[in-house]
């Protein structure tokens, strides 16, 4: 699997073995594009804050 894994400029990198999901985490308090985290995961991460949005997907570079 390959996922985007940078907060700013979109850079796609291969995921470590066993990490078959891509995720994107953002916060509704910030304008779109700010405070975004992307990466690979074994399971879909849980949100840490009330206004946090987590999206998970299972195809290459799906976390744009």
UniProtKB/Swiss-Prot annotation:
Protein location: Secreted
Top-level taxon of the source organism: Eukaryota
GO CC annotations on file: extracellular region
Pfam hit, one: Toxin_cobra-type
Family classification: Belongs to the three-finger toxin family. Short-chain subfamily. Orphan group XIII sub-subfamily.
Further comment found in the protein's record: Is classified as a P-type cytotoxin, since a proline residue stands at position 31 (Pro-31 in standard classification).
Protein name: Cytotoxin homolog S4C8
Taxonomic lineage: Eukaryota, Metazoa, Chordata, Craniata, Vertebrata
């Amino acid at each position: 699997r390959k996922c985007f894994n940078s907060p700013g400029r979109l850079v796609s990198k291969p995921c470590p073995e066993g990490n078959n999901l891509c995720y994107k985490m953002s916060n509704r308090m910030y304008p779109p594009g700010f405070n975004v985290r992307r990466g690979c995961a074994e399971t879909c991460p849980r949100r840490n804050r009330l206004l946090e949005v987590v999206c998970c997907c299972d195809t290459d570079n799906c976390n744009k």
